[in-house]
Structures are given as C-alpha cells and as structure tokens.
C-alpha cells in the first residue's frame, strides 16, 4: 500500500503541512493554493481577484504579483 502522501501513486493531492516528510511525492498535476503545501513537487497556484493576471515566479501569497488594484489570494 502506498504512503498516503505519495500523490503520484495515490492520485490524491494533499495540500497541507501533514505531508512534509518521507514518502511525499507530488506530480505536476498537484496544484495547491497558498503556501501551505509542503509536498515536494507540488505546484502552488497563484490567484488574483477579478480578471487580473498573476505574475511569473509566483510560489505563494508572498511572491504573488498581481496587476495594480488587484489583491492576491
């Protein structure tokens, strides 16, 4: 039986601090919002309010750059 945090084998993306240790492997399809995803290989999704585009190099709320007048979530 695969480790519960091994997203590649379980096809379940776990985006919380509970998956920070051994056996945690997320594939490219694993997308999490916020900076709480401790799983290696997990892609963090940057969301801006309204119809704003997110800047490049976003790894979480602290590095999310949105268009002027837009808030980052």
Curated annotation (Swiss-Prot):
GO molecular function: metal ion binding
Positions bound to Cd(2+) 2: 19, 24, 39, 42
Annotated Cd(2+) 6 binding sites: 54, 66, 70, 72
Matching InterPro entries: Metalthion_mollusc
Keywords on record: Cadmium, Metal-binding, Metal-thiolate cluster
Binding site for Cd(2+) 4: 46, 58, 64, 72
Transmembrane residue ranges: none
Domain of life assignment: Eukaryota
Record: residues binding Cd(2+) 3: 26, 30, 32, 42
Induction comment: By cadmium.
Binding-site positions, Cd(2+) 1: 15, 19, 32, 37
Residues binding Cd(2+) 5, per UniProt: 48, 52, 54, 58
UniProt family annotation: Belongs to the metallothionein superfamily. Type 2 family.
Purpose: The metallothioneins are involved in the cellular sequestration of toxic metal ions.
Quaternary structure and interacting proteins, as annotated: Monomer.
Descriptive protein name: Metallothionein 10-Ia
Biological source species: Mytilus edulis
């Amino acid at each position: 039986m695969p480790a519960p945090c091994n997203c590649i084998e379980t096809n379940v993306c776990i985006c919380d601090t509970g998956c920070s240790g051994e056996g945690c492997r997320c594939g490219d399809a694993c997308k999490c919002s916020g900076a709480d995803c401790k799983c290696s290989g997990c892609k963090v999704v940057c969301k801006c309010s309204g119809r704003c585009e997110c800047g490049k190099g976003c790894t979480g709320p602290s590095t999310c750059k949105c268009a002027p007048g837009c808030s980052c979530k």
